[in-house]
């Protein structure tokens, strides 16, 4: 019974660490964006970049979280599995940023953002960081640290909200 209680508690905390940031992001930024971006096309850029982000995160993490959980179960190799997965995502994230910067013109053309290279570069950096952090967050889940996991997720969104509001108001 103790394990069931622990599972329920951790599920609740991990769930809050996932749902609260998404709710905050939606509840705060959606009204803010609709006031800031008078032209609906400008708000459409934000929405479209989020759609690209979802697809690219799947590609850039290439199932590494699943592989991490599968192989980290062998206690003697846990540190090696973690470092290998982390280095792999670091290398692919850096290569992604380099690729985007080297081929910025064709990438912006494919995404229909010609002459908006800054959008593409910032976007690539955000996607690369998100992909890279997948394994540290998976490690927190593996180590049964739901409060730390959720706190970092929520703090991350709060910082994002503050920066977005601050930077778009300038």
Descriptions of predicted regions:
Residues 4-5, 34-43, 56-90, 108, ...:
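Transmembrane-helix boundary and interhelical linker motifs in polytopic inner-membrane proteins
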Residues 5-65, 93-101, 126, 157-161:
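Signature of the first transmembrane helix
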């Amino acid at each position: 019974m103790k394990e069931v209680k622990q599972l329920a508690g951790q599920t609740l905390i991990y769930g809050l660490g996932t749902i609260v940031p998404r709710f905050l992001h939606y509840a705060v930024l959606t009204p803010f964006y609709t006031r800031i971006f008078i032209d609906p096309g400008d708000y459409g850029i934000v929405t479209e970049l989020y759609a690209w982000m979802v697809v690219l995160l799947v590609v850039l993490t290439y199932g590494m979280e699943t592989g991490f959980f599968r192989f980290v179960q062998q206690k003697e190799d846990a540190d090696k599995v973690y470092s290998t997965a982390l280095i792999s995502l670091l290398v692919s994230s850096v290569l992604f940023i380099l690729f985007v910067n080297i081929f910025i013109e064709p990438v912006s053309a494919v995404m229909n953002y010609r002459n908006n290279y800054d959008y593409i570069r910032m976007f690539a950096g955000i996607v690369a960081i998100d992909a890279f952090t997948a394994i540290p967050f998976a490690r927190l889940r593996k180590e049964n640290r739901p409060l730390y996991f959720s706190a970092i997720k929520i703090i991350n969104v709060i910082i994002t909200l503050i920066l977005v509001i601050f930077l778009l108001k300038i």
